[in-house]
Amino acid sequence: MQCGLVFSKWIDARSGRSTDVDDDEVDAGRPAWLDGPVAGFLARFMVPPQSMGKASRIAHGLLLTALFCYSWTFILGDVRTADAWNGFLHGVNLVFHEAGHLFMMPFGRFMHVLGGTLGQLAMPLVVCIAFVVSRGDTVGASVGLWWFGQSLTDCAPYIADARKLDLQLLGGGTGAERDGHDWEYLLNTLGLAPYDLLLGSLVKYTGGAIMLLAVAWGGWMLWRAQADSARPVDI
């Protein structure tokens, strides 16, 4: 409740709306971070885009609808075959995956191998945050969050393949033909290889939930942007 009051007041101030919540209504014993930059930063993710025209709202709405439909390709995909992940986005994720390997190379073998996954997950989050910080566009940020969820599902088939090593790898050949792959090494190092299929499925559904949550967030921001545009302007 305390956090909600702080966020509500911050959002109202950003949108020009008055608030009838007095400072003394908020418990003086709340954590200090609720009044600090962290609360202000998080609250920015709850502010709808300002001055979004009707055409822009329609275009964003169509995009979110398409992403909602596309999400089910990955949510319902079989992590044992990876057929659902052999599309355009897999190639995009692969670019940042390989960049992550290079970036983490100085930090030892485990981090070097894990760096591929970290790289492909970090870039969508950077996009999400950049939309909010640089443009105040929470609808655009929701697309970045959707990409993060999709990139997480992109890891799932390789996690599930840690023991079988049947998936084709970059450059040709399967993991069995090329001494394994990233997640074969990572799960064996952590002693989790016997749970590869379970972990792969868990990662897939977690990513799918994030994708749907991102679409819901974007839809909510669009609805609030529409409500703000319909509100009479005080003169």
Question: Can you name each region flagged by the protein language model?
Answer:
Residues W33, P37-G40, R44, G91, ...:
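Low-complexity, intrinsically disordered, cysteine-poor segments enriched in small/polar
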Residues K9, M104-M105, M123, D161:
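Active-site-proximal flexible loops/turns
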Residues H90-M105, G116:
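Active-site recognition of the HExxH zinc-binding catalytic motif
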Residues M1-V21:
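Cys/His-rich metal-coordination motifs, chiefly Zn-binding "fingers/knuckles"
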Residues T19-V21, V26, R231-I235:
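Short, low-complexity, intrinsically disordered N-terminal peptides in bacterial proteins
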